[in-house]
């Protein structure tokens, strides 16, 4: 392939070769060379399967192409072919049988000959035996006369050619056919797809009906005038295109003639002449897509509602004025295009189109926004432009888009508030609405999904306030929103106030006890460590109990065996191992069948029955029939509940191994329910996080709820690697930046185990690193619940071998934040950011093609302006256009990996990147060309087929990740459809040709597209349904990708939920499952799925639940999940030894909504009815008709963590039988004696004030002494739950003994439900304890209307201790945990209800931190704790704690609220008005004592008594206090800091206070006369207002002169608009007037804001000051910058916690002093110019041997480093003329003198005239080379050497020069002429582009003139015009110093000049005289 490589280097084109494919495009070789290289290509790669030669002007194909025996696809489009190499030589006998193998490519399947020059049909293609697809579009064919293929003659003597192939697809579009080719209907009967568009055919022959296999027919743009009747016989036709013809509708019956097309799904009839809607179309009920645009239809018939399957309807460019009401019956319609009609309104029924995604209504006659649009909750694209709407509506549409207009009207249900009652029906009808029926639940899934906007707002507010909710961690434990049965937040319509909240039980994990351990691991450890002895006793007791239970089980088993031997009547398959009196009804196992189906996957369905039978034996509804134990192939790990013995068949195709960066292009911020969590849940979650991190109940007295590395439990299960190891969090970073908590995220690299189960996805060791998007990032922060993206995210340090380094992690976070913002703002129009037309031209052309506008309309649209075209494009593709504004990027380091399985032979595109920064410090945006490794979008679209090689699919994956704007074009061209086509092919051929790797990469591509533009994927037909079908895959990686896609989709409000539910329901129907949630639960139980993926699955489940706003609908979904075994899965996850925080979070969230909804529904319909819904009663009723009726009892065990159990009763079934059965078949954590059977009451719940009595008089506990029938339980439902327990409570009361009040401790007993949480116990006991108890030490406040909940309840807790003597050794129970979790064995303990540590949000230095304080200690101790927490060296006496008292909103208008300081001597409890306040730890004003001295001459008596001033008083106030008593004018005096002798040290600024100027107790001040103050002493803030004394302007209003202080003021003023230019001028030349230290001191003065200045304005000034400092460093040159950095380090600001900007200034100083600066910008170019190395003889080179151009290059390389090192300070005040003042300038000047001297010496050193002339000419050539390189400095050096007197006098030598050289020299001399101040040089330099080197001598002269011709000061003001002139000259020099020359150094040439020693002028002149003596004649010269 050497020739191919040479092609690549010398000609434009793209080449791509791998093991089986070769692509050559756009080659410019001549025909002969091209054919020769093709011959070489065929010989070199004989195994090629795909050969592409496109756009190469190929005229013939080499004959040896037939040697490619494996060739299956040959693409020769866009060439000049007219014949093929397979022609058979005539004559050819008809009956001769030939073997074609020797002359054809017998394996060729696809042949593309489009866009060539065929005038006759290439008959030879029919000799290709396996040809399936033939493309001959855009040729010049007029017929298909096939005569050269042999064949036979028919009865009529007509020749019938022999056709060896069986074509399936034939494309003949855009040829010259006038008659339909008869051979198609006669012999090509195997065709499935036929394209004859763009011809002039008028009719179809009768033989056309022979094409019985035809599924797609395209007859677009022909001359049909009626519907071809022969089409009606095509039963398999799916797609028919008859657009752009002249077909008419029958005027009588308005019919077209369409009939008998039962399979037709897509019908295209646009651009015809329909005056009426074709009525017979409405009978084709299979239609999914109907296109009728650009006709003359004015009315849509009512029967349009018949098309129930219609998905897309195109009716644009008609004359429609109204739509029929029946259009609302098109319930599956997703896309509706109605633009360019005359529609004035929409029918009411239009609102029924609930699935509508795209609605285009622009250019109609709408006069108002239709109300019907408000109900279309799934709209993704809406266009209402160019209607007759109000001007305000039109303005909003233009600026924000049509969807934004709908949202603004607050009617679209994108986030409607929940029903305040929690249900849409009365309690009477509630029981029938969601009666546990799975089918009924499925029916309402899509119609009832709404999101609660108030919840979303609440969460957003929580996140905006960072950790604000942390203060309410305990508040919300027992206080939430309980409005008539809903568990969500209610909001007032206008948002003006909050409705009053009532106390409720809702909080995180507030669930009935499920038999699971508490998830608060860190709290339990603290508690267990304090009670170690007690636990040991408990363990001993448990062991004894277990032994007793084992003995009982053995006895019961023996009894059962004996009874079975006696002839028990129970069925062997359902008999209990305990007793035969219990028969388990099999209906409870119905849903297990569905789970088993899902676990087995696609290949194991044949083994379904045996697998289910083996697992269901033994009774019970546990996951494996053995009591719910986890069977995980030898150990506990990632899976739950496997099916023993199931095997899978090995699939064909490769195994999918995802790339390491396949999962989550950027890691997500994980939350469990996206944007829909209730506020009460949110607050509970915040507390849960706090508890997890050891923040509550630790008894430490203080601490912050930050994440500690020690508080996160690593997963280290030995049996599985699927459990994630959470990251180690850098607590230092978190503690110093609390905002990090709300911004943290992480990513994980999993090491999946080598798969030993039934899957073919074996991972070799080198592929075990699997980058997963784990939800454990949730462990970092709950505050990210409302924003899963990623936004800008900060990464914590990750100490795991499986994580990326922090730099890569941050880049991924920033990238995912961008993807997330795409989702958030996808509806925002981009009209305000119109890119160049070249960027969106392709998209615009695609739009015109897609929408298929009429020719006239296209011409009109093409004439639109750029802005109008962009606006039109926005109407259709607003979800992808944001990509057009993205910068294309290329990662050079990854270029070699972009196409992993391909070798890039060549890419002739040279990428040049130029980085630069403007002089004002703003960086120029980097411009980088597209990654040349990728092909165009069109290439991928054309080649993405079911036969596509996996390498191309991988390349598409990389292309979508890295190609930016090209992705939009890829989508517009049908890229999504191409990917779905590959998936559909693999799904249809799963048993034969399933390619797992290809499927995996296609899904990865879709995942990328979902992240970038989810709406485009959603609006693609059947996309998500198809993706969901792969949930049965045996590859865990494919499952992971699908779950990631779900996760991403659910970020879209409303539509995301609907799409996911829709796909699950479709999956349910296709697979015949009983519930749409079966796939999700099956994944949770699948052992091959890893825990991070299972966590995401559970997160999806939670979000689906929370998306239902109506209580009963939500509970119906929960019940559906209960029936498919979700509780068993939860129990198994809880039992795992190491469970991630994020998974526990999801489990808690599910239990939260289950419990809260259950409790609310119990209040409405009664507990018995609720239990019925939670059970499988409906399934039993459906089967009772076929079974003999008998008594039964249904036992609901939800509270124990299981489902329900239906037991058939007989007279012998006893209470003990049931309990024993449960104990034997289920894992009940606690002693079975603590449980009982409870019979709930009938009817709604009526509370009597006790939280223990949960039902009316009919509720009761089952009597254990009676049989179940005697207990009246026949056909009843009972609940298996824990019995009440007794607790001891300490109550301290005050008694009177002999008139003395004494405290006495009393212990009382109370009965409580052990499943209660501690905060509920607090609530309960506070209503029953004596009022003198510590629980009442603080009064319960009365809620005001604007308060969210009762704040007091959160600060009371349960303090546990064993006896009064050991009271101090007790522990706090976490409020959110169950009492039973910390007292599992009911050990006798005493509890005390008292105030807990109080959490406060402390604000200091702009940072907010949650801390906890003992409410009983003085505030002074709190101040010390805060100081220790912030780790700053501050004077504690200067600081205090302040807060703003809470005031009711009704009083805000009449009160002026002032902050209050906490009294250090009091406790927190003494400050009743600081409830819910954020306290501030800040500087507290105090009095300082100073001595004031008086300067002589001032009539103020001296005194030894110190003055007392408040340190917040300004100096002007203090001067006034001193002068006023003595009748002195304060404005005439100043105040200095002095020493004790009165020596002035520093002038105090009049505007700043004592504290700002570090005046402390004992300091000395001296008051002086202001007249003696020097200008340099004035503070910037003391500068007077603008006047002629401080600033003057020129006529053009430019600054002419200005004082230093005024200049600093202007540069940092928020109002000043000319600061950018002034800043550059000043910073470039400030060293001419002041030193860097003076400038820094002035800037720090300006940054210190006086107290009296407005705070917001002060922050703006500080910000501009910091920006000025940053620009200062950026504009400094290297050495000067080092000097300034040293000053920054020496003047680092002092520590402060005030929000005074010092923290930001310190961070800036640190950043600037550690930042790396680059003075020269790198230039990325192609290959460097080839250097010309001279001949070297004995290590010596002569001048004659050196090339002139190479000399110029090497001298330029020597000059530029010297030139680029010139410092700014060297150019000011003629510093270079002073000794040592300008070393770099002198180096450049010295090189100039050396070269000039060398020129003169080299010329005169030649003894002969001829040699001198040659050298002279060579010097001219060098000078010209310097000019070409824009090295003006050395160009002038050459000219200077040539014009030196020793050379100038050599007239004979110069006379020997050629005319060209003389002219060249004259031109150069004219360019560098000094006349008119070097006008020519100035102009040429101004037009030059870098790299270049100016002539330094000229610019130094300019600087001398500037310095000497302009004074420095004008009346003590800076001459700013002089600085401006300085800047102009310096900028010219510095601009070219950034871009170096790019040549290869040649050391021997450089050393030649470096070693040259300057020769004195006198010897050179003598040599000149010797060469040409004075007055010598020509003949005297040698």
From Swiss-Prot:
**Predominant location of this chain?**
membrane
- A GO CC term attached to the entry: plasma membrane
Q: From what organism does this protein derive?
A: Dictyostelium discoideum (Social amoeba)
Its organism's taxonomic lineage begins at: Eukaryota, Amoebozoa, Evosea, Eumycetozoa, Dictyostelia
Stretches assigned to the Extracellular side:
1-1831
- Per its record, what are the GO molecular function terms? actin binding; guanyl-nucleotide exchange factor activity; small GTPase binding
What name does the UniProt record give this protein? Ras guanine nucleotide exchange factor V
Q: Which residues form the GBD/FH3 domain?
A: 832-1236
Q: Kindly give the membrane topology term recorded for this protein.
A: Single-pass type I membrane protein
All copies of domain N-terminal Ras-GEF, residue ranges: 1595-1717
């Amino acid at each position: 392939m050497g020739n191919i490589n040479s092609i690549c280097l010398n000609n434009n084109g793209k080449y791509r070769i791998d093991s089986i494919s070769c692509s050559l495009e756009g080659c410019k070789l001549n025909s002969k060379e091209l054919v020769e290289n093709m011959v070489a290509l065929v010989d070199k790669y004989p195994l090629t399967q795909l050969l592409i030669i496109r756009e190469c002007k190929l005229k013939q194909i080499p004959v040896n192409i037939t040697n490619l025996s494996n060739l299956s696809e040959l693409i020769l489009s866009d060439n000049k072919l007219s014949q093929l190499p397979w022609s058979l030589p005539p004559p050819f006998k008809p009956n001769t049988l030939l073997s074609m193998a020797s002359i054809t490519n017998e394996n060729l399947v696809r042949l593309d000959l489009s866009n060539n020059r065929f005038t006759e049909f290439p008959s030879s293609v029919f000799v290709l035996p396996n040809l399936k697809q033939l493309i001959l579009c855009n040729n010049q064919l007029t017929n298909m006369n096939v005569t050269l293929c042999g064949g036979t003659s028919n009865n009529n003597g007509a020749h019938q050619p022999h056709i060896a192939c069986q074509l399936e697809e034939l494309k003949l579009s855009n040829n010259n056919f006038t008659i339909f080719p008869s051979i198609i209907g006669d012999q090509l009967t195997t065709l499935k797809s036929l394209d004859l568009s763009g011809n002039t055919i008028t009719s179809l022959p009768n033989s056309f009906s022979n094409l019985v296999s035809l599924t797609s027919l395209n007859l677009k743009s022909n001359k049909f005038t009626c519907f071809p009747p022969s089409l009606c016989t095509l039963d398999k036709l799916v797609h028919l295109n008859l657009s752009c013809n002249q077909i008419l509708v029958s005027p009588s019956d308005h019919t077209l003639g369409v009939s008998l097309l039962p399979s037709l799904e897509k019908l295209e009839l646009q651009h015809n002449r329909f005056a009426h809607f074709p009525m017979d179309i409405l009978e084709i009920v299979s239609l999914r897509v109907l296109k009728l645009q650009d006709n003359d239809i004015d009315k849509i018939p009512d029967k349009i509602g018949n098309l129930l399957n219609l998905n897309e309807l195109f009716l644009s460019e008609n004359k429609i004025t109204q739509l029929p009401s029946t259009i609302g019956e098109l319930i599956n319609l997703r896309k509706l295009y109605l633009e360019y009609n005359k529609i004035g309104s929409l029918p009411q029924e239009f609102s029924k189109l609930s699935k509508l995604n795209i609605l285009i209504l622009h250019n109609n006659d709408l006069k108002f926004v239709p109300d019907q649009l408000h109900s279309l909750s799934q709209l993704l694209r809406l266009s209402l432009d160019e209607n007759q709407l109000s001007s305000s509506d039109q303005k909003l549409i233009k600026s924000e888009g049509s969807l934004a207009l709908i949202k603004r009207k607050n009617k679209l249900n994108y986030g409607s508030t929940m029903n305040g009652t929690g249900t849409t029906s009365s309690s009477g009808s509630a029981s029938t609405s969601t009666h546990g029926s799975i089918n009924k639940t499925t029916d309402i899934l899509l119609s009832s999904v709404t999101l609660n906007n108030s919840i979303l707002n609440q969460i957003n507010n929580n996140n905006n306030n960072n950790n604000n909710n942390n203060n309410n961690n305990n508040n919300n434990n027992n206080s939430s929103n309980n409005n008539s049965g809903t568990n969500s937040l209610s909001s007032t319509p206008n948002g003006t106030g909050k409705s009053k909240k009532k106390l409720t039980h809702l909080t995180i994990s507030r669930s009935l006890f499920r038999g699971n351990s508490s998830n608060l691991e860190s709290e339990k450890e603290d508690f267990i460590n304090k009670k170690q002895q007690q636990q040991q006793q408990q363990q001993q007791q448990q062991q004894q109990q277990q032994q007793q239970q084992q003995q009982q089980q053995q006895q019961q088993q023996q009894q059962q065996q004996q009874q079975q031997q006696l002839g028990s009547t129970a069925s062997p398959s359902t008999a209990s191992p305990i007793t035969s009196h219990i028969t388990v009804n099999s209906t409870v196992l119905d849903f297990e069948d569905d789970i088993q189906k899902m676990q087995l996957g696609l290949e194991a369905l044949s083994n379904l029955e045996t697998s289910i039978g083996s697992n269901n034996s033994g009774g019970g509804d546990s996951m494996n029939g053995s009591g719910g134990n986890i069977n995980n192939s030898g150990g506990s790990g990632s899976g739950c509940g496997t099916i023993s013995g199931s095997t899978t068949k090995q699939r064909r195709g490769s195994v999918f191994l995802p790339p390491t960066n396949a999962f989550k292009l950027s890691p997500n911020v994980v939350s469990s329910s996206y944007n829909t969590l209730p506020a009460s849940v949110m607050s509970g979650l915040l507390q849960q996080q706090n508890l997890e991190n050891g923040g509550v109940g630790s008894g430490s007295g203080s601490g912050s709820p930050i994440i500690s590395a020690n508080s996160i439990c690593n997963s280290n299960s030995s049996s599985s690697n699927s459990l994630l190891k959470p990251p180690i969090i850098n607590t230092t970073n978190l503690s110093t930046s609390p905002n990090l908590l709300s911004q943290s995220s992480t990513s994980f690299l999993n090491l999946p185990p080598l798969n030993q189960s039934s899957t073919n996805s074996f991972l070799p060791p080198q592929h075990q690193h699997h980058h997963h998007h784990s939800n454990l990032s949730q462990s970092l922060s709950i505050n990210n619940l409302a924003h899963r993206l990623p936004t800008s995210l900060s990464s914590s340090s990750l100490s795991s071998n499986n994580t990326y380094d922090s730099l890569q992690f941050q880049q991924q976070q920033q990238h995912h934040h961008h993807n997330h913002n795409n989702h958030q703002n996808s509806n925002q129009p981009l009209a305000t950011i119109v890119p160049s037309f070249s960027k969106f031209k392709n998209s615009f052309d695609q739009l015109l093609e897609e929408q298929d506008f009429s020719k006239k309309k296209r011409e009109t649209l093409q004439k639109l302006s750029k802005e109008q075209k962009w606006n039109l494009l926005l109407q259709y593709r607003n979800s992808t256009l944001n990509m057009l504004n993205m910068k294309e990027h290329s990662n050079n380091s990854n270029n070699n990996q972009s196409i992993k399985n391909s070798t890039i032979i060549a890419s002739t595109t040279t990428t040049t990147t130029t980085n630069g920064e403007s002089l004002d410090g703003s960086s120029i945006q980097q411009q980088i060309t597209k990654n040349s490794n990728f092909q165009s979008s069109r290439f991928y679209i054309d080649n993405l087929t079911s036969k596509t090689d996996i390498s191309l699919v991988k390349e598409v994956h990389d292309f979508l990740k890295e190609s930016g704007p090209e992705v939009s074009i890829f989508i517009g061209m049908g890229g999504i459809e191409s990917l779905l086509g590959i998936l559909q092919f693999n799904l249809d051929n799963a048993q034969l040709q399933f390619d797992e790797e290809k499927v995996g990469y296609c899904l990865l591509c879709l995942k990328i597209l979902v992240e970038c533009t989810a709406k485009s994927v959603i609006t693609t037909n059947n996309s998500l349904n198809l993706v969901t079908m792969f949930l049965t895959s045996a590859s865990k990686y494919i499952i992971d990708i699908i779950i990631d896609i779900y996760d991403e989709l659910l970020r879209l409000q409303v539509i995301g939920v609907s799409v996911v539910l829709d796909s699950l329901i479709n999956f349910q129907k296709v697979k015949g499952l009983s519930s749409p949630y079966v796939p999700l639960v099956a994944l949770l139980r699948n052992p091959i799925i890893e825990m991070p993926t299972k966590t995401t699955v559970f997160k999806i489940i939670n979000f689906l639940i929370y998306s239902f706003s109506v209580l009963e609908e939500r509970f119906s979904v929960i019940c559906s999940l209960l029936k498919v075994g979700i509780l068993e899965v939860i129990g198994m996850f809880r039992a795992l030894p190491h469970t991630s925080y994020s998974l526990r979070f999801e489990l808690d969230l599910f239990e939260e909504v289950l419990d809260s909804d259950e409790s609310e529904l119990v209040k409405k319909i009664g507990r018995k009815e609720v239990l019925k819904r939670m059970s499988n009663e409906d399934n039993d009723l459906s089967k009772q008709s076929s079974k003999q009726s008998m008594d039964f009892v249904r036992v609901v065990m939800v509270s124990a963590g299981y489902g329900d159990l239906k037991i058939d009763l007989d007279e012998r079934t006893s209470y003990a039988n049931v309990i024993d059965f449960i104990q034997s078949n289920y894992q009940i954590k606690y002693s079975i004696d603590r449980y009982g059977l409870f019979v709930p009451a009938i009817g709604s719940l009526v509370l009597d004030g006790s939280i223990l009595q949960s039902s009316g008089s009919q509720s009761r506990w089952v009597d254990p002494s009676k049989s179940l029938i005697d207990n009246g339980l026949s056909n009843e439902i009972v609940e298996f739950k824990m019995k009440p327990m007794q607790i001891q409570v300490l109550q301290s009361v005050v008694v009177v003994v002999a008139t003395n009040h004494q405290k006495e401790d009393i212990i009382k007993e109370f009965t409580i439900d052990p499943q209660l949480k501690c905060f509920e116990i607090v609530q309960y006991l506070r209503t029953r304890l004596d009022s003198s108890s510590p629980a009442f030490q603080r009064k319960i406040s009365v809620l005001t209307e604007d308060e969210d909940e009762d704040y007091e309840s959160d600060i009371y807790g349960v303090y546990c201790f064993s006896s009064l003597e050991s009271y101090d050794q007790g522990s706090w129970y976490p409020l959110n945990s169950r009492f039973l979790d910390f007292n599992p064995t009911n050990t006798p303990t005493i509890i005390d209800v008292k105030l807990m540590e109080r959490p406060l949000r402390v604000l200091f230095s702009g940072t907010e931190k949650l801390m906890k304080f003992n409410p009983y200690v003085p505030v002074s101790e709190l101040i010390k704790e805060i100081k220790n927490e912030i780790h700053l060296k501050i004077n504690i006496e200067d600081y205090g704690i302040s807060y703003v008292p809470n005031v009711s909103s009704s009083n805000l208008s009449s009160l002026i609220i002032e902050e209050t300081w906490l009294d250090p001597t009091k406790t927190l409890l003494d400050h009743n008005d600081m409830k819910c306040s954020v306290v501030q730890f800040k500087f507290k004003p105090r009095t300082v004592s100073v001595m004031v001295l008086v300067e002589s001459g001032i009539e103020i008596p001296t005194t030894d008594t110190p003055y007392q001033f408040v340190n917040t008083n300004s100096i002007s106030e203090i001067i006034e206090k001193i002068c006023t008593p003595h009748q002195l004018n304060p404005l005439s005096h100043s105040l200095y800091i002095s020493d004790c002798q009165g020596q002035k040290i520093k002038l105090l600024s009049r505007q700043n206070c004592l504290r700002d100027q570090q005046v402390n107790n004992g300091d000395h001040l001296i008051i002086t006369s202001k007249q003696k103050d020097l200008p340099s002493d004035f503070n910037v803030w003391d500068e007077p207002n603008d006047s002629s004394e401080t600033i003057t302007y020129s006529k053009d209003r430019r600054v002419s002169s200005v004082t230093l202080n005024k200049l600093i003021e202007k540069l940092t003023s928020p109002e000043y608009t000319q600061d950018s230019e002034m800043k550059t001028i000043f910073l470039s030349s400030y060293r001419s007037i002041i030193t860097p230290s003076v400038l820094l001191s002035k800037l720090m003065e300006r940054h210190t804001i006086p107290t009296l200045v407005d705070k917001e304005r002060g922050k703006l000034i500080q910000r501009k000051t910091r920006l000025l400092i940053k620009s200062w460093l950026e504009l400094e040159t290297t050495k000067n910058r080092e000097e300034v950095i040293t000053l920054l380090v020496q003047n680092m600001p002092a520590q402060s916690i005030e929000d005074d900007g010092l923290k930001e200034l310190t961070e800036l100083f640190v950043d600037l002093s550690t930042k790396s600066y680059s003075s020269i910008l790198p230039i990325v170019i192609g290959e460097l110019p080839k250097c010309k190395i001279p001949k070297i003889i004995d290590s010596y080179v002569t001048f004659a041997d050196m090339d002139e151009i190479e000399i110029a290059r090497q001298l330029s390389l020597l000059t530029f480093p010297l030139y680029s090192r010139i410092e700014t300070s060297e150019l000011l005040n003629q510093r270079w003329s002073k000794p040592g003042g300008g070393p770099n300038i002198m180096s450049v000047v010295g090189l100039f003198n050396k070269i000039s001297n060398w020129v003169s010496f080299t010329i005169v050193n030649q003894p002969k005239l001829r040699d001198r002339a040659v050298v002279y000419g060579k010097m001219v050539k060098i000078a010209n080379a310097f000019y070409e390189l824009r090295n003006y400095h050395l160009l002038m050096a050459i000219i200077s050497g040539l014009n030196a007197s020793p050379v100038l006098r050599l007239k004979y030598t110069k006379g020997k020069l050629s005319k060209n050289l003389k002219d060249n020299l004259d031109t150069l001399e004219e360019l560098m002429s000094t006349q008119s101040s070097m006008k020519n040089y100035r102009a040429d330099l101004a037009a030059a582009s870098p790299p270049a080197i100016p002539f330094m001598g000229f610019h130094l002269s300019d600087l001398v003139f500037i310095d000497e011709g302009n004074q420095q000061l004008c009346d003590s003001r800076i001459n700013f015009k002089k600085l401006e002139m300085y800047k102009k000259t310096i900028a010219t020099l510095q601009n070219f110093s950034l871009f170096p020359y790019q040549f290869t150094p040649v050391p021997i040439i450089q050393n030649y000049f470096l070693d040259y020693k300057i020769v004195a002028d006198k010897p050179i002149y003598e040599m000149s005289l010797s060469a040409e003596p004075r007055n010598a004649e020509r003949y005297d010269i040698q």
